[in-house]
Amino acid sequence: MKNVREFIWPLIGLLAVIVSGWLLYRELRGMSLDDVWDSLTAVPSHRYALAALSTLFAYAALAWYDRIALLHLGVRHISWLFVSVTSFTTYALSHNIGASVFSGAVVRYRAYTSKGLSAPQIAVLVALCSFTFGLGTILLGGVVLVADPTLLHRLEELLPSMLTNPATARIVGLLLLGFVALYVVGSVLHLPPLVIRKAKLEYPRPAIMVRQLIAAPLELLGAAGIIYFVLPSHLEPSFIVVLAVFLASFSAALVSHAPGGLGVFELVFLTAMPDIPKADVLAALIIFRLFYLLIPFALSLVVVLLFERARLAQAWRGRMVADGSVPPPPLSSSDQ
């Protein structure tokens, strides 16, 4: 059964790419590459700079996820720089590969074992980082739906009419915020672990929980900011609209298991932004993929190669010393 699951999820991801690609083709037919290029070149340079700063902000927040998990484990000897580079590499790879839990676990295992962490500790770290991200999505989703439940009307082509109803949307938002409130209560009152099937949620101590609530939304705010800043300034909707559409698009991309959410993310975003020219929206999404996914992915490959080269060189030197191939240092006069 496990082998079947390992085969079926990549197949679902591939199917999601094909279906969303076909739907995107229908959505974008008639648009020329010149239209998209004109939209890309129309973005002012200072807007590109703001998008780049939003990218740095988002990845800094992701590094805080790792730091919070290490504090939960009582690990304080690892430097912020090492944590930041590890987190950056982890998410840059997993965002593009698609299997975020698997690829994140592999990268973190290679990095954190070099700092003395055990496999069970790294498993807890990976789980807590994933939960922190989910907590941020739930928290922001609840806030957005309660603040403006009419936002789901933008997805009426993709969702049942019952869900896009403002009253239903507000109830969903309140339920999401209720989940966050229960998590806070569980942490403050030191409740026993919450068990759902095989998953067990250990409530962290309040100091960790508060950090999670602060850090969890920041990455999503930064990522949504990339798109917000490069949309046409005379047409751009409010930030809460961009954030709501981003949350829906990003969540759909994750659920689809498509590598990097390819096609799925764009389809949902374009559908939910009918009031902005499609070429301008597509240009903003291209910039998002470049800043948030492709450039970090290229840099992460360099980091992995340098790290593995250093580990290999260290292992080789250790083997040479063990085999006696490296002569001992000469004796000093005091030793003779």
Predicted regions and their residues:
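Transmembrane helix boundary and interhelical loop/hinge segments in multi-pass membrane proteins
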Residues: 100-108, 264-265
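Interfacial segments of multi-pass membrane proteins
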Residues: 111-121, 244-245, 266-283
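Transmembrane alpha-helix interface/packing and boundary motifs in multi-pass membrane proteins
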Residues: 89-98, 245-266
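Internal, well-ordered alpha-helical segments in soluble enzyme and binding-protein domains
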Residues: 108, 118, 124-131, 138, ...
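Membrane-interface segments at transmembrane-helix boundaries
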Residues: 73-84, 107-127, 197
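Predominantly cytoplasmic-facing regulatory/coupling regions of multi-pass membrane proteins
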Residues: 1-88, 146-254, 276-287, 291-336
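Membrane-embedded alpha-helical segments of transport systems
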Residues: 89-97, 113, 118-141, 252, ...
